[in-house]
Amino acid sequence: MSSEDSLKSLSLDYLNLLINGQAFSDVAFSVEGRLVHAHRCVLAARSLFFRKLFCGLDPNHQPPPPPPPPLNWPTAGGGGGGSGGGGRGGAGGGGGAPATPELVIPVSSIRYEVLVLVLQFLYSGQASVAAPKSGPLPGCGARGCWHTRCGAAVDLALDTLAAARSFGVEQLALLVQKQLESMVKEASVDDVMKVLMASRKFEMQELWATCSHLVARSGLSADLLAKHLPIDVVAKIEEIRAKSPLAAAAAPRSPFLTHHYLPMNPASSAADRDNKIRRMRRALDAADIELVKLMVMGEGLDLDDALAVHYAVQHCNRDVVKALLELGAADVNSRAGPTGKTALHLAAEMVSPDMVSVLLDHHADPNSRTLDGVTPLDVLRSLTSEFLFKGAVPGLTHIEPNKLRLCLELVQSAVMVTTRDDGAPVTGGEAGGSDGGNFPRSDADDSLVSLTMNSTLMYQGQEMAAAVAAGEGRKSNNGRGSPPPAMYFPNGFA
């Protein structure tokens, strides 16, 4: 066996001691409700931090007494038989050393995965800083992610780097630095900036140089960088840009068209697009509009191609949609799906007054039509008709009638305003004149007021029907059904 093989075997033996060392451990670390068993002699020999820690424990803590001699072990006094009997009694009949209480040290400054990585390196001299591929990693919700450049993998590496510096394990810190240098080349801009600040804190010049050049090439403006980085760091990045041959090419570009001058790999463009969309959706779910802005300006994310507004309307709250639209990088009237629905169509189908109002406030077109010619008003009119004739919408029992009425009024008002602004007369009997504007009055437009009256009667009728149904429920069932809903709508669609 060569010396290299011997060292590998020794490293593996020590690693197995850590993995299966509960029976022989004399110290345990309590982290995140889990115990990690270890051995003070190994940790003290490998790390000055642990040596000082174990030497500076509570003075009331006394080291465990030496174990009694094993069975039949020759002693200076000779009496082998007597010691043997005492050995059995002291060991409880097991013939071994009496168990000593294990020292438990609570740990709150680092997480479980980081502590395990540090201990693995201390025991074996080797550690894989990269997260397990395709396995679960806290902080990463993407299915099938290989954790080579995701934010969770970067955070794990940064936490391991900080722990290595705290424990005085410089070799592990260098190993993590090399890992980060390869990760940042494919990581997002916000992750690169996190690594940049960590390299500055720990004075890692090579990692600093790599990250600073990547941020300089990102195309983010100095004003935006100043919101996330110290002023002196922004100044150094601007100096790098001034010396870079890409500065002249990047200067006249729009902030929303960055990275277009960088080489693209067609083979990975589809995977990159899907990864960007997943990260954008996670940012929207977390209401992190700044991260979305960084992705737009630093990575060239197309919000319309990613259907950002549609996703936000369906899965986020009003404030997120409002902030997203105020970025100015998304078209509120962009279409999605095989029928070409706009975000306003989705808001109408959801019967969400909050979404309808915020979209209309940001100039959503109430007259936009799908490929089938359906407008948002048509969607609401159809839902209203279902309520008028059936009293409820099949599959949409969660819809509140008051919200439906409010959505209807909002869209109707927007249609009227749009029609008036486009030049269609709306006063007196001239509403149907032959010289109408771009949106001539039709039978649908003429029925807006009638539809409002009918919808108002609908809600009043539903309240009356509910009261009658409650009264009938208290009576005995005599076979007479409740009156049909149409009796409450004398001016309905009959």
From Swiss-Prot:
Transmembrane segments: none
Stretches for region Disordered: 60-95, 421-443, 471-494
UniProt superkingdom: Eukaryota
CC per GO annotation: cytoplasm; nucleus
Pathway info: Protein modification; protein ubiquitination
Residue sites binding Zn(2+) per the record: 140, 145, 147, 150
Database matches in Gene3D superfamilies: Ankyrin repeat-containing domain, Potassium Channel Kv1.1, Chain A
MF GO annotations: transcription cis-regulatory region binding; zinc ion binding
One of the GO BP terms on file: plant organ development
The UniProt record lists the keyword Nucleus: yes
Biased composition, class Pro residues, residue ranges: 61-72
Compartments, as annotated in UniProt: Nucleus; Cytoplasm
ANK repeats: 275-303, 304-334, 339-368, 372-406
Residues in C2HC NPR-type zinc fingers: 137-151
Domain notes: The BTB/POZ domain mediates the interaction with some component of ubiquitin ligase complexes.
Name listed for the protein in its UniProt record: BTB/POZ domain and ankyrin repeat-containing protein NH5.2
Native source species: Oryza sativa subsp. japonica (Rice)
Primary gene name: NH5.2
